[in-house]
């Protein structure tokens, strides 16, 4: 059933990409080839688990095709879906090679004797590699990396053909073995071409700290009355894990610095004791990891990975709602860590007692430790945050500009930094200094008055729909043409900038879209306003109309 569903999805995806007005970019021959290497493993709890034979295929699917697959999949399944791609080197893809690749892409199985022959790059699908003309440079930025929370491993450079001819084939890591088999003679102990080999389970290192962002430290965190309690608690936890507050539960509106504090805990704790095993994950990453472990029958490895830790930090714990299996596993993980006197740090956009969609036994455990809330910073703190931002980005700005922005944008740090970035982008596009004149021009009619202005998602959608001469239902729908998709992405961006709504809440306002769709739109438009004058002007004009609108 899964294979049939996946075939329908890929066929629809390719068909949509050929339509002139489609939002989905043209899918190249190379990308079609990678699509045919994909094998569906499971569709569970709103996540499609896909298997590919090597890391280059994983990178292509996630980076260039992920959002398009998510869109088609969600529409077909009748609920929001995300995609989790995993590398499975044991996949037998030889018998299922794509048939729509030009004949000149076929590569012989033997190594030619010509000394200057260069074998196919091991990053490409077996037996063929695209010519330069196959790259879709027109849409190279359409689906930027990072649209979802997956970690993509960059493929290692391939060995030269000369080395391949001079040295016998040796055992390689799983992600490279298949490609190497196409380029060099096989030793007698290696499996025959196309034969399924026994799965070699990759080792997982629970000590790995690659999930921690080194930029998020206590040194770069601006402390004020609005965040002093969670900051003090976080510092104490980092200095003495499991001896101060366990669990530590940090909550507050989106964009106030919860994630920064969690990374700071991990970075400082490992600075004090490099032997500590620290892991930071979002609730979505935890869910994906759990689903993959069930699929691969590797639950014991999963348990070791999350229970053999000194500090476990899970961000946005509220997103475990509706995932009963994941909640069950997290409950047991929580108990195991707490009984072993290991530190647990959680974050959410609301206090534990308001997490009514989670099981009672989880909420009561969250309430057993210290609950620390963060609220919007005061004026002096907002100015300090902007000074730090300007210094970190190497941007020179007059202090009165920072005071102007800080005095008018007080809902969240994200909104504050967004206004600063907008001024910086305007100055960059116009090659102007960042002074009061530039700031006032960039933010003309956009800054709220001293009195609070209530801006809602409905107001933003109404103004955007009118601006682009479409109705609100069309804007909220699933239309893929640029005339509809672009306004929708602009509206999602403005909802993120001008309201305190979380990503899932914004998605609900747009017809139940998944939060990853909102995240993709926010990043895409945020990138475009620094590169495309048309997009920048649209955001300016829409914001002006929204803030001067009397709509309810």
UniProtKB/Swiss-Prot annotation:
Residues making up the signal peptide according to the UniProt record: none
Cellular compartments per GO CC: cytoplasm; plasma membrane
Annotated spans, Domain II: 90-210
SMART domains: AAA, Bac_DnaA_C
Region annotation (Disordered) ranges: 113-213
GO biological process: DNA replication initiation; regulation of DNA replication
Compositional bias of kind Low complexity: 155-170
PROSITE patterns, per database record: DNAA
Region span, Domain IV, binds dsDNA: 428-552
HAMAP family: DnaA_bact (MF_00377)
Oligomer and partners: Oligomerizes as a right-handed, spiral filament on DNA at oriC.
Name listed for the protein in its UniProt record: Chromosomal replication initiator protein DnaA
Organism: Corynebacterium diphtheriae (strain ATCC 700971 / NCTC 13129 / Biotype gravis)
Gene name of the encoded protein: dnaA
